């Protein structure tokens, strides 16, 4: 049984009225839903692709104007913290958009990770739809109020070991660290990542974890503990 979409309720949450509501319906359509209901003409994947770029542009512009003295490296890592899946999941939650997602019955969303991914993709797809329908301005009006204020953004730059390492290497060596991810298996056979962090071609640290993001953090933390006496 196909579900109906309460377009007006979503428009109210977004404070945006679609000239082409079909774009919104497409944004709500998870690929698994289209697999179960072939009458759904298109799923959200292409709009996700577009929305990801829109989000990145708006957040980049926001940070650029908010922090006029911040260097490119810290702007980049701060942006990453504001556009990643966890951040997009939180934006979806703030707007209460998740309840409108059209998703197949067979799609597993029981795990928290699965829900984060689905909701993050939904947010990006909706941004893509808003951009196509109304341009960059309404997309910006949706995104910017969801972002943390300046005082809340500042700690994001230093709490993450990757950000701290980048700041340290830029200040002391005028270079950025680079990361290399390799496949890895834990003792119980679970797949994961072995990440190495290099500075000026030298290995500074390593990390092992189930996710690449966590392994990168561990590698950066080891690099800091070895090379930065303040940590």
Swiss-Prot record:
Residues 160-229 form the DRBM domain. SUPFAM superfamilies: dsRNA-binding domain-like, RNase III domain-like. InterPro entries: dsRBD_dom, RNase_III, RNase_III_dom, RNase_III_sf. Its EC number is 3.1.26.3. It catalyses: Endonucleolytic cleavage to 5'-phosphomonoester. One of its GO terms (biological process) is mRNA processing. The active site is at 52, 124. Its cofactor is Mg(2+). Digests double-stranded RNA. Involved in the processing of primary rRNA transcript to yield the immediate precursors to the large and small rRNAs (23S and 16S). Processes some mRNAs, and tRNAs when they are encoded in the rRNA operon. Processes pre-crRNA and tracrRNA of type II CRISPR loci if present in the organism. Homodimer. This is Ribonuclease 3. It comes from Chlamydia trachomatis serovar L2 (strain ATCC VR-902B / DSM 19102 / 434/Bu). The gene is rnc.
